[in-house]
């Protein structure tokens, strides 16, 4: 049985707003680890979309945004994207040379968020290229949160 495009979108929205089993360290994040990781079934960890009223959802969700903005990322040449990531996150010789990076990663977030966080954490630990000064990158864990801002009280984010 296959799902329509709309049904796939609905399933994706529920999956992406889920809380997953907690990850204590980004060092644990590997492909097999993520493949074996499950949605957290604790009743207090109800999916974000299941906790929001219809009015809240209608006021915050834009189902057409993917087609307008994010889908272009699927067509980017990976080498170009990687070079741009390095330039933005590490290079202090370009624009905003005095800007530091603070990555907040959520330990119950979906797999892609953890993988990206691990990537940035590895950049932070890597030595600078020869003759280069590297941007300061800090990586902090938000405990008990998924990647939806509404699930983490704002004071916790500001305090971190």
Model regions: which residues?
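Catalytic histidine-centered segment of alpha/beta-hydrolase-like enzymes
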Residues: 139-158
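Short, conserved active-site loop motifs that form the nucleotide-linked donor/cofactor pocket
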Residues: 101, 137-138
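Alpha/beta-hydrolase
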Residues: 1-118
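Solvent-exposed, non-transmembrane amphipathic alpha-helical segments
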Residues: 35-36, 121-123, 159
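Active-site-adjacent alpha-helix of alpha/beta-hydrolase-fold enzymes
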Residues: 110, 114-135
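Short amphipathic C-terminal alpha-helix that caps PH/PH-like domains
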Residues: 15, 158-160
């Amino acid at each position: 049985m296959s799902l329509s495009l709309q049904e796939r979108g609905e399933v994706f929205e529920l999956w992406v707003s889920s809380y997953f089993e907690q990850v204590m360290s980004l060092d644990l994040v590997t492909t097999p680890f993520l493949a074996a990781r499950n949605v957290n079934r604790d009743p207090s960890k109800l999916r974000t979309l299941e906790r929001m009223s219809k009015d809240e959802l209608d006021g915050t969700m834009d189902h057409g945004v993917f087609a307008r903005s994010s889908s272009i990322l699927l067509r980017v040449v990976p080498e170009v994207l990687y070079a741009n990531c390095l330039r933005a996150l590490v290079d202090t010789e370009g624009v905003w040379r005095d800007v530091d990076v603070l990555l907040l990663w959520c330990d119950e977030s979906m797999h892609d968020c953890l993988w990206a966080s691990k990537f940035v954490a590895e950049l932070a630990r890597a030595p600078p290229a020869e003759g280069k000064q590297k941007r300061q990158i800090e990586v902090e864990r938000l405990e008990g949160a998924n990647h939806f801002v509404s699930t983490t009280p704002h004071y916790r984010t500001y305090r971190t």
